[in-house]
């Protein structure tokens, strides 16, 4: 089995940073790129930009203005799983399986806010429930 290079980046809006991501992909040349907080719907992902760089395969779960996860791959993706946690469909977790059986999961875990108390802070409660 040949080595597999995986990179991960909380991009905080893939459309605003498509040129930065493209530059990184050219320099680092990972086999798989996981992006979190893409902040756009599936149909607005700039996938053509990444296909030109050799990332012919993609799995994604987008959400307008919030969250969103994207996996770009040079290798063929056989299976895609989209997960929901805590009863919310908030585009935070996607998993793929490659031809050689390797599975890759991309998660965007909630920040949880400033107050680490599940009773007083609903965002922190969501983070703890997610984990």
Across the structure, where does each feature detected by a protein language model lie?
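Generic low-complexity, intrinsically disordered sequence content enriched
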Residues: 29, 75-76, 128
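Structured beta-strand-rich core segments of catalytic domains in phosphoester-bond hydrolases
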Residues: 38-116
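N-terminal, active-site-proximal structural segment of metallo-dependent hydrolase catalytic domains
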Residues: 1-53, 67-69
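Soluble or luminal CAZymes and related metallo-dependent hydrolases
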Residues: 13-17, 88, 122-130
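Surface-exposed cleft-lining segments at the edges of enzyme active sites
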Residues: 109-131
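Short amphipathic alpha-helices and their capping/turn segments at secondary-structure boundaries
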Residues: 23-25, 92-100, 129-131
């Amino acid at each position: 089995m040949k080595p597999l290079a995986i990179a991960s980046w909380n991009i905080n809006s893939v459309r605003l940073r498509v040129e930065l991501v493209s530059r990184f992909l050219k320099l680092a040349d990972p086999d798989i790129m996981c992006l979190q907080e893409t902040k756009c719907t599936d149909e607005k992902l700039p996938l053509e930009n990444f296909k030109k760089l050799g990332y012919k395969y993609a799995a994604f779960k987008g959400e307008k203005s919030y969250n969103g996860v994207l996996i770009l791959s040079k290798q063929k993706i056989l299976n895609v799983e989209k997960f929901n946690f805590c009863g919310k469909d908030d585009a935070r977790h996607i998993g793929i399986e490659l031809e050689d059986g390797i599975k890759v999961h991309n998660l965007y875990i909630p920040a949880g806010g400033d107050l680490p108390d599940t009773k007083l802070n609903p965002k922190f409660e969501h983070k703890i429930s997610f984990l």
